């Protein structure tokens, strides 16, 4: 196995920059850079590092050596903590590249080596990636749970039950002359029923984990000049959309990213929707606005208090569902009695974006819907489309299983189900079945 290195921290000015080295030559490389031979594992040392060929000083650093297998990758690992300087990073990188037998790591290669050395399964590796990319508290909670092995435990439990079923079926087929009780098939049937129901229910999760991981799309919809761009700017706390009294100013979809109550929200300001427009570009913007609303997870539909009749057109009303927040904007410009019927009919919030009236209620409603759609629970969710694909395949094989069919074919359905679950965690080894057979039965008794 080659020895690899990379700067683990971001390149640029910082208090500290961290370099990681992993592989059989890690300790030798550290000795070359420092001129010191005696390094104990898991102790931090204050050292000077120099260019091995010229002995030019690179930096005064802190270094630590992790002896295999007690490291992140399971290999010998060295970490070098330098000052966070671009010049130091370049000098150390060049010095390492000039040492024989060491190369720059590929993206994700340290984590890949950790997986190959059985430090964790594929779901935990994906959890680490999600943890690095997490931008909100709820994303962090989901990622840390996955990285700590909660998903692995769930899938391994299902796979263990499948292997038990498989061992019982294999024994029933391969050892017909042995004294195997008929209750074996009853146990298989009961486990099969439980797993079908459990996995079916697990898949029927409204993609909560995936929504939390990728972010919930929120589209702001309404007629022209109703205040959509002003609302977007308020939510983003900065001007990212042009605000104008001229109808049709927003022609395309404008996006912004927001953290509301710990949930990642992808805001989309859209072109104003009106029934007639002679402008070809605006027509395309309206078409995109409607499509954006149809694919959005959450919608804010805005009505103009001064122009309620023109605000409420069929295209907009048809977009309302249980995840829609309807608001009447510009309430400061009209008497409350004039909007009462519409307010009640569509359960609208009464706000004034311009004068910052009742805008906190919009944030609270967004948070409530986000929590309902992607709220964190103790049961681990599916967080990745890869997992969902394999689980759907597993359920398909599991559903096809029937003891009324050929027993060999039925056994193959269970085998394929176990392989699909194993593919999620990265553990696929049908030889485990043999161990299950001898563990559960005394063959030749």
Curated annotation (Swiss-Prot):
The keyword Ribonucleoprotein does not apply. The keyword Protein biosynthesis does not apply. This is tRNA modification GTPase MnmE. The gene is mnmE. It comes from Rickettsia conorii (strain ATCC VR-613 / Malish 7). Residues 215-371 form the TrmE-type G domain. Belongs to the TRAFAC class TrmE-Era-EngA-EngB-Septin-like GTPase superfamily. TrmE GTPase family. It comes from the Bacteria. K(+) binds at residues 225, 244, 246, 249. Homodimer. Heterotetramer of two MnmE and two MnmG subunits. Exhibits a very high intrinsic GTPase hydrolysis rate. Involved in the addition of a carboxymethylaminomethyl (cmnm) group at the wobble position (U34) of certain tRNAs, forming tRNA-cmnm(5)s(2)U34.
């Amino acid at each position: 196995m080659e020895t690899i290195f990379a700067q683990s921290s971001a390149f640029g000015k910082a208090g500290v920059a961290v370099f990681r080295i992993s592989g059989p030559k890690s300790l030798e490389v550290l000795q070359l850079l420092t001129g010191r031979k005696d390094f104990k594992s898991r102790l931090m040392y204050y050292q000077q590092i120099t260019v091995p060929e010229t002995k030019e000083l690179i930096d005064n650093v802190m270094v630590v050596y992790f002896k295999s297998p007690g490291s992140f990758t399971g290999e010998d690992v060295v970490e070098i903590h330098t000052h966070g300087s671009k010049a130091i990073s370049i000098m150390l990188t060049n010095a390492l590249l000039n040492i024989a037998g060491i190369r720059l790591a590929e993206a994700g290669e340290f984590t890949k080596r950790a997986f190959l050395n059985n430090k964790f399964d594929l779901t935990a590796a994906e959890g680490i990636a999600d943890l690095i990319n997490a931008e909100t508290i709820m994303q962090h909670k989901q990622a840390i749970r996955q990285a700590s092995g909660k998903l692995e435990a769930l899938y391994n439990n299902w796979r263990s039950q499948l292997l038990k079923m498989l061992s019982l079926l294999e024994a029933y087929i391969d050892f017909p002359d042995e004294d195997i009780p008929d209750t074996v098939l009853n146990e298989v049937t009961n486990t099969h029923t439980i797993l079908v129901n459990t996995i079916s229910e697990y898949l029927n999760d409204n993609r909560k984990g995936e929504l939390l991981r990728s972010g919930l799309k929120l589209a702001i919809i309404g007629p022209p000049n109703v205040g959509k761009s002003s609302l977007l700017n308020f939510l983003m706390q900065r001007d990212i959309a042009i605000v104008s009294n001229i109808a049709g100013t927003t022609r395309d979809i404008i996006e912004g990213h927001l953290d509301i109550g710990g949930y990642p929200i992808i805001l989309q300001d859209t072109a104003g929707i009106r029934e007639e427009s002679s402008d070809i570009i605006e027509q395309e913007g309206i078409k995109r606005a409607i499509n954006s609303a149809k694919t959005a997870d959450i919608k804010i539909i805005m009505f103009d208090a001064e122009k309620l009749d023109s605000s409420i057109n069929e295209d907009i009303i048809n977009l309302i569902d249980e995840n829609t927040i309807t608001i009447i904007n510009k309430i400061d410009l009209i008497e409350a009695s004039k909007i009462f019927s519409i307010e009640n009919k569509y359960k609208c919030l009464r706000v004034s974006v311009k004068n910052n009236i009742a805008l906190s209620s919009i944030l609270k409603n967004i948070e409530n819907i986000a929590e309902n759609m992607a709220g964190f629970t103790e049961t681990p969710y599916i967080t990745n489309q890869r997992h969902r694909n394999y689980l759907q395949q597993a359920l398909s094989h599991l559903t096809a299983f029937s003891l009324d069919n050929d027993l060999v074919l039925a056994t193959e359905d269970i085998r394929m189900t176990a392989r699909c679950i194993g593919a999620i965690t990265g553990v696929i080894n049908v030889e485990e079945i043999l161990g299950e057979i001898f563990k559960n039965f005394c063959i030749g008794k």
